[in-house]
């Protein structure tokens, strides 16, 4: 029953995508596909469309169709992560730390901090900021397996050609108890630390898994992080602003969006397999004579721009879903990938037409990775199971 339901969903999903769903697929997308099909099709009732909409949104883990603003920003980190796990040519080199984190997760989420909550008292030789990330959009059923805080540090002109000096130490703390009237500094717990030499520009990644797990799985209050930059060499004229833990006075929005701090969570909702690097599958060539009408896989490309979903689905722009269609004639040939039950059912059908023939259905399905903006304009990379037909057979 479960396999049959999955096969049905695999077949119905492209039909819903291409046929339209009220509210989920805009009217423009439905008209566009109807015009390209060249023939009129009966319109499903509003009740059926609403039911399909609910099912599709549930599959994506969404409560409503995302409608992101034009100012929504997709962090380059998330784009690179998508390219890695979708096996795209020109993707960044493999990162063993990222591969390890993704191997236990099927969902990656990114969060920007709330800038209005940054300020902390300055101390001599240190730069400190509070980072608060609102994580309430993480579903309760999603178990966080790892989390990292990404901070960008810029190359200092004073450090060029000097490998011996200009070191900073970056400390990341979890806020256990916020500052009070009696104490201007919050109570903290050290999570990660790193000594850096600022002779190059690069992102630094810090492990904040223990804190995020306490906030999401154990119900502890989320008071945010403290990022502390300790200036180890006090030299005349040396800038202390090389670590981008706060916005400059007059930056343009695009530049700031590319280097602002980012919290990335890796989680698993218990559905399907973890993220993996998708390898291109080799077609199985079998030298057998097949009837043109026999059960086999047919091309079906779902283009998200055609149905008006490209405003919230970042990547891929579409995908090859394929579908199964064809006859399951008696006697069933070996290449039709039939079960014993299908063989018996086809045999009985040959002598009793009241018993239906075996059906041409997907026998093997695979997942795709999708990068999209959710209802809260948070960027999500998620692995969706049973989205691509890999093989067909008579069942």
UniProtKB/Swiss-Prot annotation:
This is Bone morphogenetic protein 2. Residues 24-281 form a propeptide. The gene is BMP2. It is found in: Secreted. Residues 273-292 have a biased composition (Basic residues). Pfam families: TGF_beta, TGFb_propeptide. InterPro entries: BMP2_TGF_beta-like, Cystine-knot_cytokine, TGF-b_C, TGF-b_propeptide, TGF-beta-rel, TGFb_CS. One of its GO terms (cellular component) is cell surface. Keywords: Chondrogenesis, Cleavage on pair of basic residues, Cytokine, Developmental protein, Differentiation, Disulfide bond, Glycoprotein, Growth factor, Osteogenesis, Phosphoprotein, Secreted, Signal. SUPFAM superfamilies: Cystine-knot cytokines. Homodimer; disulfide-linked. Interacts with SOSTDC1. Interacts with GREM2, RGMA, RGMB and RGMC. Interacts with ASPN. Interacts with MAFP5. Interacts with FBN1 (via N-terminal domain) and FBN2. Interacts with type I receptor BMPR1A. Interacts with type II receptor BMPR2. Interacts with SCUBE3. Interacts with TNFAIP6 (primarily via Link domain); this interaction is inhibited by hyaluronan. Interacts with ERFE. Interacts with BMPR1A/ALK3; the interaction may induce HAMP expression. GO terms for molecular function: BMP receptor binding; cytokine activity; growth factor activity; phosphatase activator activity. Belongs to the TGF-beta family. Residues 1-23 form the signal peptide. Glycans are attached at residues 134, 199, 337. Growth factor of the TGF-beta superfamily that plays essential roles in many developmental processes, including cardiogenesis, neurogenesis, and osteogenesis. Induces cartilage and bone formation. Initiates the canonical BMP signaling cascade by associating with type I receptor BMPR1A and type II receptor BMPR2. Once all three components are bound together in a complex at the cell surface, BMPR2 phosphorylates and activates BMPR1A. In turn, BMPR1A propagates signal by phosphorylating SMAD1/5/8 that travel to the nucleus and act as activators and repressors of transcription of target genes. Disulfide bonds join 295-360, 324-392, 328-394. The modification Phosphoserine is found at residue 86. Residues 270-292 are annotated as: Disordered. The lineage of its organism: Eukaryota, Metazoa, Chordata, Craniata, Vertebrata. The keyword RNA-binding does not apply. One of its GO terms (biological process) is osteoblast differentiation.
């Amino acid at each position: 029953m479960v396999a049959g339901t999955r096969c049905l969903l695999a077949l119905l999903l492209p039909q819903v995508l291409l046929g339209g769903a009220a509210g989920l697929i805009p009217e423009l997308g439905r008209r566009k596909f109807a015009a390209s099909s060249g023939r009129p099709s009966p319109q499903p009732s509003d009740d059926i469309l609403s039911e399909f909409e609910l099912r599709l949104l549930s599959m994506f883990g969404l409560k409503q169709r995302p409608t992101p603003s034009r100012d929504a920003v997709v962090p380059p980190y998330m784009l690179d992560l998508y390219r890695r796990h979708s096996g795209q040519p020109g993707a960044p080199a493999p990162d063993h730390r990222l591969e390890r984190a993704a191997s236990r997760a099927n969902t990656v989420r990114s969060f920007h901090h709330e800038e209005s909550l940054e300020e902390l008292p300055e101390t001599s030789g240190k730069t400190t900021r509070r980072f608060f990330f609102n994580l309430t959009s993480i579903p309760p059923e999603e178990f966080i397996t790892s989390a990292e805080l990404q901070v960008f540090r810029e190359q200092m002109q004073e450090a060029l050609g000097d490998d011996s000096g200009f070191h900073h130490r970056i400390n990341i703390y979890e806020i256990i108890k916020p500052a009070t009237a009696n104490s201007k500094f919050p109570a903290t717990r050290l999570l990660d630390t790193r000594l850096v030499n600022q002779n190059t520009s690069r992102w630094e990644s810090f492990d904040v898994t223990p804190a995020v797990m306490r906030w999401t799985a154990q119900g502890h209050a989320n008071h945010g992080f403290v990022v502390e930059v300790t200036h180890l060499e006090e030299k005349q004229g040396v800038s202390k602003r090389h670590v981008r833990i706060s916005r400059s006075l007059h930056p343009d929005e695009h530049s700031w969006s590319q280097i602002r701090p980012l919290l990335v969570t890796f989680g698993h909702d218990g559905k399907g397999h973890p993220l993996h690097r998708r390898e291109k599958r080799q077609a199985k060539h079998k030298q057998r004579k097949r009837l043109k009408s026999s059960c086999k896989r047919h091309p079906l490309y779902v283009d998200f721009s055609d149905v008006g979903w490209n405003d919230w689905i970042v990547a891929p722009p579409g995908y090859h879903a394929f579908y199964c269609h064809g006859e399951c004639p008696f006697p069933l040939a070996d290449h039709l990938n039939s079960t014993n039950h299908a063989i018996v059912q086809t045999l009985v059908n040959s002598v009793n037409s009241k018993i239906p023939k075996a059906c041409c259905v997907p026998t093997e399905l695979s997942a795709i990775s999708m990068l999209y903006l959710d209802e809260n304009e948070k960027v999500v990379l998620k692995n969706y199971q049973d989205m691509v037909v890999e093989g067909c057979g008579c069942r």
